[in-house]
Amino acid sequence: MMAAAPIQQNGTHTGVPIDLDPPDSRKRPLEAPPEAGSTKRTNTGEDGQYFLKVLIPSYAAGSIIGKGGQTIVQLQKETGATIKLSKSKDFYPGTTERVCLIQGTVEALNAVHGFIAEKIREMPQNVAKTEPVSILQPQTTVNPDRIKQVKIIVPNSTAGLIIGKGGATVKAIMEQSGAWVQLSQKPDGINLQERVVTVSGEPEQNRKAVELIIQKIQEDPQSGSCLNISYANVTGPVANSNPTGSPYANTAEVLPTAAAAAGLLGHANLAGVAAFPAVLSGFTGNDLVAITSALNTLASYGYNLNTLGLGLSQAAATGALAAAAASANPAAAAANLLATYASEASASGSTAGGTAGTFALGSLAAATAATNGYFGAASPLAASAILGTEKSTDGSKDVVEIAVPENLVGAILGKGGKTLVEYQELTGARIQISKKGEFVPGTRNRKVTITGTPAATQAAQYLITQRITYEQGVRAANPQKVG
């Protein structure tokens, strides 16, 4: 999925286009529809180079890079191309795919892309299946159809050449290659700098289609106008990676909260899911907007909320997802969403570890259901998790205190305190952990104090108990794991 652009050499402009037609094919009259592989004057000399920008699923990136970067170095040496990938967590907006920019001759672009396509087709079996695990365990479930797709990002000008007058060129590309070629939607309002081309088919069909698309890149003088591999700081709208739906990918201001949710809730692909049922009984006005906004935010970034094990009751989920207000605060919306799920779980009844009513708003009961009963009645955390819930001195905020076993505090903190910071950013609550050696009297438990709005404190409490529950489950399955 890359976009290729010409680099002029010594001011020469004579082109050497690729001709996919057999040598004995007859030339068509000028008035006939354009061939997908037609040979218009190109913008570079015989030694000219171009750029191709493509999307690479996260599961394939490692095999393309290789151990210590050996594979990608060897690929560059063999093809003469230069290959750049966005950083491991720097995804194209609205996806969990990395951006790859290839620079080289037409032959090199085709060779490198052929290698990348092969690695994408090698989807590991454990990536394609979903297991009933804690929502805090990272997941990489991918749409199985992705292995048959190529996603190329091209400048808007190149997209016009690929489509052709009245769609004649893209039709010819499909006819000659046998692949299905679609472009992301063209917006009525703000023009996009780039469009995403999705090619679907068998390996050989996709290979031919990509060669024809690279020809169009070769013909466009502006095809090298968008050479960024990171979209983290791009202002304004960005093209949707999918050919259907909105022309635009997720906006930059939504991504930070959704990205934080990625690490906290675990990833599961939701491609093609248009909406969640979310007419919640007992919620109206701003509350409903916040909750539905959170659903939209997380779903649009690819997170399957159904895997939380906290599905809303049928009575509470009887309609289509309300349109999220553009002004809604994503962090507050996510907090409200988590709080709502926990409340629904509380109302659903008891769990293996005890009754839901034992714990404030059912959040620990929810955690039990979501983690296959790892959080049983014998758990020290289950026995004394909630130390107290009260209002702050000024009465404006809730204060929740939780007891956490000393040997599990590290799971909440994360490396360098990263997990704790993410929890606070996602929920808007303030989370404090007692100093090392300061225990709840008579125990070896540290005290965790959560301060914030009711929704924020409950969301933070829920995330903390989920993390602890997951860590306990991992240790139960692997007794050798410590700390």
Curated annotation (Swiss-Prot):
PROSITE patterns: KH_TYPE_1. GO terms for cellular component: nucleus. Residues 49-116, 147-213, 397-464 form the KH domain. SMART domains: KH. InterPro entries: KH-I_NOVA_rpt1, KH-I_NOVA_rpt2, KH-I_NOVA_rpt3, KH_dom, KH_dom_type_1, KH_dom_type_1_sf. A motif (Bipartite nuclear localization signal) lies at residues 27-43. Its main location: nucleus. The KH domain consists of approximately 70 amino acids and includes a conserved hydrophobic core, an invariant Gly-X-X-Gly motif, and an additional variable segment. The third KH domain (KH3) binds a hairpin RNA loop containing the 5'-UCAY-3' motif on targeted molecules. RNA binding by KH3 requires residues C-terminal to the KH domain. This is RNA-binding protein Nova-1. It comes from Macaca fascicularis.
